[in-house]
Amino acid sequence: MRKKVLLMGRSGSGKSSMRSIVFSNYVAKDTRRLGATIDIEHSHVRFLGNLVLNLWDCGGQEAFMENYLSAQRDHIFRNVQVLIYVFDVESREFERDLVTFRNCLEATVANSPQARVFCLIHKMDLVQEDLRDLVFEERKAILLETSKDLETTCLATSIWDETLFKAWSAIVYTLIPNTPTLESHLREFAKAAEAAEVILFERTTFLVISSYSSESNPATDAHRFEKISNIVKQFKLSCSKMQAQFTTFELRGGNFSAFIVPYTEDTYILVVIADPEIESAVTLMNIQSARRFIEASKSASDGIQLQP
């Protein structure tokens, strides 16, 4: 099952940097050595079982953009599931970028009218902290008005914090065909295991696929999942540099315990238990039981097939 994703935006806006961090295990400081994308770079990323992201990273130089919108228009914009357009928040040519974005939208509507659009207002770390919300909301209002013919989501991003993982988790979530089923499984598992929270991560990228939070244990940090994605991925990279393999993580505090363990061939699961009296062995046994159940469910469906 292939899903075509276009990654577009002006040259230097940060498209290839974010792609390299999310899918190629780069750290933010190493993206400085990346050169400009020439024409189109194709990546086929096997994301979950039989789901393949067919990612088209389109070079943003003006000559390339003109070609995309003329000679290659039908070829590029046909059968697109998601258009990701990256805006450099510090660009001094926002109006010009907006014209190009509008042209890309017209091509998308003509060739892939059911596509979803994600506008990433990028490099937000360069904006003064107390002005970030204001700047983002101003740009968001303009972009939503411009893209009203397509379902559009605007997100603020930076390669230096968890916002990058939050944005790409949101994008990938729209491409997964059976998220209601996954959410139902996690909810039932959480109730059976008496878990405060359960989060499912894709194994390679550590993007959030699905989650469940108990109403009896409300969380205080809305960005906790993406922060965990970022932290664990950095830890996995550190393990790789030391020629060590990240397998399982367990943390026990005074009033909680947390486990990150392999769930299926394609996923990790994070389970947070608020009752400190529940033994680790019980939680791990519950995870093993749930693993068998979800594998059986997926193998019987036409959606993502998670293999042991």
From Swiss-Prot:
| EC number assigned by the record | 3.6.5.-
Q: Its principal location?
A: membrane
Show the SUPFAM superfamilies listed in the entry.
P-loop containing nucleoside triphosphate hydrolases (SSF52540)
Write out the entry's keywords from A to Z.
Answer: Cytoplasm, GTP-binding, Hydrolase, Membrane, Nucleotide-binding, Nucleus, Vacuole
Topological relation to the membrane, as annotated: Peripheral membrane protein
Give the molecular function GO annotations: GTP binding; GTPase activity; protein serine/threonine kinase activator activity
What the entry lists under CDD domains is as follows: RagA_like
Query: Which terms under GO biological process does the entry name?
Result: cellular response to starvation; negative regulation of autophagy; negative regulation of cell cycle switching, mitotic to meiotic cell cycle; negative regulation of TORC1 signaling; positive regulation of TORC1 signaling
Chemical reaction(s) catalysed: GTP + H2O = GDP + phosphate + H(+)
GO cellular component, alphabetical, reads: cytosol; fungal-type vacuole membrane; Gtr1-Gtr2 GTPase complex; nucleus
**Quaternary structure (record):** Component of the GSE complex.
Family membership noted in the UniProt record: Belongs to the GTR/RAG GTP-binding protein family.
Protein name per UniProt: GTP-binding protein gtr1
Q: Which organism is it from?
A: Schizosaccharomyces pombe (strain 972 / ATCC 24843) (Fission yeast)
Its taxonomic placement starts with: Eukaryota, Fungi, Dikarya, Ascomycota, Taphrinomycotina
Name the gene behind this protein: gtr1
